[in-house]
Regions:
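Conserved motor-region signature of P-loop NTPase helicases/translocases
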Residues: 1-64, 115, 123, 193, ...
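Accessory N-terminal region flanking or inserted into the helicase ATPase core
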Residues: 1-21, 30-31, 48-50, 108, ...
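Amphipathic alpha-helical interaction segments
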Residues: 9, 90, 139-142, 154-158, ...
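Conserved ATP-dependent motor core of P-loop NTPases, especially the RecA-like helicase ATPase domain
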Residues: 15, 46-57, 70-228, 294, ...
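Amphipathic alpha-helical segments in well-ordered regions
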Residues: 35, 91, 95, 99, ...
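Core structural elements
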Residues: 86-94, 146-165, 275-279, 297-299, ...
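Short coil/turn segments at secondary-structure boundaries
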Residues: 106-109, 134-144, 159, 171-176, ...
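Polynucleotide-recognition surfaces of large bacterial nucleic-acid defense/processing enzymes
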Residues: 446-451, 455, 536-582
Length: 623
């Protein structure tokens, strides 16, 4: 199929950096491949074209398409197969291996996969928290009480990861300032006043909402600052477009003010947390250095530092590329963008992406970077290419998606035009809407009714639908259920299991953050360190024993801690440490407690995976 006119304009644009804003199903990957091929056809050496993607699958697909494109040109195809087409992290790793000494790395460094890195982070966090629990008990308990969470180690790791988004963690923590309460409150008030000034009041609903904001502004100074901020309520539904957008800024300012007020009220704990984070960061770095290893963030940070050095190496790296092609630019994070800025030469950058499709799962992706890039080119009078023809979806799906998206906060307008070629007719509507309400008589919530209906409707569709070319009956693996929140997953799993329908749940969570894995980890932490009160408390509250907070408090106050129903069991486990490997201890314990009995397949699979990891780790480092 030949390129459309809008695709061709993007592929052949010259004399400027290119920004291609591509809607879903509009051929983003094809345009990037064709740009690569067009540059080769224009005489550019494939080895001097750098193409960066965000997944190995995408990089492989680009190379496959290019190889097919030049299938009859042996020598050229071979050069294409060796062209620098890779993920961001693949590119960084290659560059750092070439310049390991300049980057301050062991030339034989290895890259930790996410599971290995997470394991080191868990070990580092546990080690530091154990030291604090024993050596700085009072400060540690005050911090944990203020944190009000069951898993301080997971929270510590999460805060550390968030800080890494901004660069060097130690530098950020050392430069961390105080909280400007007055500034945050004034900014919130200014945003609210701006809303009252621009909002239309031509309906009773609009007038009532804006007058409520004015009344809230009038109460400033009459109540505690935190209570005043919490008192602000604003439903933007029904407001005019400009007021709705400003209302979103008001609520963002409210969240910022709450964060500032909360931080200010916990300043002592904040200082303790800063010290704890610095120790954790140092411990994590030490453990990586001991293995001559780096994680994905290190790849980015060290590449950025390498490109910022004085000397011939950075200049040679920049000069080796005549063109840089970037796929899915909306998934770029700030460090990656700074790497691109140091690599790029003027008018040699080609980027495709869609602000409305950022998947955020790529380490700290910041869609605003793509928006800023687009706005910068527009301010310079450069052309922006827009791909608006959708080749993937039926017109009914596109019109429904557009109707929903245009009312959603943070979604930028982008027209989706269905391709002219008609789809084969379907025996069922392409979009169905079903409304659910809780049934108090049946004692069932809306989610239970919804799960039943979804399973029933999927069974109907499986009997009715034909897919593919040539048509074939639809299979279960052809179907997917998307949920706005994870709350529905349990109901759905139960309904699918009851009907004998196979399903696999993708929760988008880290394996080590799954509740059952947290339970296993807490038990092992306690067995490794019986003085770890946090781990013991979590074990007692978990499904292993199911002891409530009040009972734990009473038992502890009366000197029965651990409580009678848990004490003997835990003593047997502690005794078994001397003669049995941890995976066998945990497996027998799970069997004795009936922990996995009646659990969904996902939980059983996670347990099997965790036990396998334990076996591997213990074999590699027994004891």
């Amino acid at each position: 199929m030949s390129l459309s006119e809008e695709q061709r304009r993007a592929v052949e644009r010259t004399g400027q950096d290119v920004c291609c804003v591509a809607g879903p199903g509009s051929g983003k990957t094809r345009v990037l491949v064709e740009r690569f091929a067009w540059l080769i056809g224009d005489g550019m050496d494939p080895g001097r074209i750098l193409a960066i993607t965000f997944t190995e699958k995408a990089a492989t697909e680009i190379k496959r398409r290019l190889a097919e494109r030049f299938a009859g040109q042996g020598a050229l195809r071979e050069r294409i197969e060796h062209a620098p087409v890779s993920t961001v992290h693949g590119f960084c790793a290659t560059l750092l291996r070439e310049h390991a000494l300049d980057a301050g790395l062991d030339p034989g460094f290895r890259v930790l996969d996410e599971l290995e890195a997470e394991t080191l982070r868990i070990e580092a966090a546990d080690a530091v928290l154990d030291e604090w629990a024993i050596g700085r008990t009072r400060e540690f308990r005050e911090l944990v009480d203020a944190w009000a969470c069951e898993n301080p180690a997971a929270h510590l790791r999460a805060v550390h990861e968030a800080l890494r988004k901004g660069g060097d963690v130690g530098e950020q923590l050392r430069e961390m300032g105080g909280f400007d309460e007055a500034g945050a409150l004034e900014f919130l008030a200014a945003e609210a006043r701006a809303l009252t000034e621009i909002a239309e009041r031509n309906t009773e609903n609009r007038r009532t909402k804006i007058e409520a904001v004015e009344a809230w502004l009038g109460r400033r100074g009459e109540m505690d600052a935190l209570a005043w901020v919490l008192d602000l309520a604003l439903n933007r539904q029904g407001l005019d477009k400009g007021a709705s957008a400003q209302g979103q800024r008001v609520m963002a300012a409210k969240e910022e003010a709450l964060a500032v007020l909360a931080g200010s009220r916990h300043q002592p704990q904040r200082e303790v947390l800063r010290a704890l984070l610095l120790e954790y960061d140092a411990e994590y770095q030490r453990r990586k250095a001991a293995e001559a290893a780096v994680d994905f963030h290190d790849l980015e940070a060290r590449t950025l530092a390498l490109l910022g050095r004085d000397g011939p190496a950075p200049r040679e790296i920049v000069e080796r590329y005549d063109a840089i092609l970037m796929d899915e630019l909306q998934d770029t994070n700030p460090v990656q963008w700074r790497i691109l800025e140091r690599l790029r030469r003027p008018d040699r950058f080609f980027a495709v992406g869609d602000l409305n499709q950022s998947i955020y799962g790529f380490r700290h992706a910041e869609p605003g970077l793509f928006q800023s890039y687009q706005e910068k080119l527009e301010a310079e009078g450069r052309e922006i290419d827009r791909l608006e023809t959708n080749y993937r979806s039926r017109p009914g799906i596109l019109s429904f998606a557009s109707a929903v998206a245009e009312r959603s906060a943070g979604v930028r307008p982008h027209q989706l035009i269905p391709r002219e070629a008609p789809f084969a007719p379907k025996p069922v509507p392409v979009v169905e809407i079903q409304r659910f309400q809780a049934d108090p008589d049946a004692g069932e919530g809306a989610s239970g009714s919804e799960a039943k209906w979804i399973v029933y409707r999927l069974e109907e569709l499986k009997r009715e639908l034909q897919v593919g070319d040539p048509p074939r009956p639809v299979r279960w693996k052809d179907m997917a259920v998307l949920a706005r929140t994870k709350a529905l997953f349990g109901e759905l799993e139960a309904e699918f299991a009851a009907r004998g329908i196979p399903c696999a749940v993708r929760r988008g969570r880290n394996f080590f953050d799954e509740q059952e894995v947290v339970d296993f980890t807490n038990l092992l932490r306690y067995l490794a360190s019986p003085l770890d009160e946090i781990a013991l408390y979590a074990v007692l509250r978990s499904p292993f024993f199911g002891i409530g907070d009040q009972e734990i408090l009473v038992e502890r106050r009366e000197g029965r801690y651990p409580p009678a129903e848990a004490g003997p069991v835990l003593e047997r486990l502690l005794a078994a440490r001397e003669s049995e490997p941890p995976d066998r201890i945990l497996a027998r314990f799970l069997d004795e407690r009936g922990y996995l009995r009646g659990c969904p397949a996902r939980v059983r699979a996670n347990a099997a995976k965790f036990l396998g990891l334990l076996r591997t780790w213990h074999s590699a480092a027994p004891g």
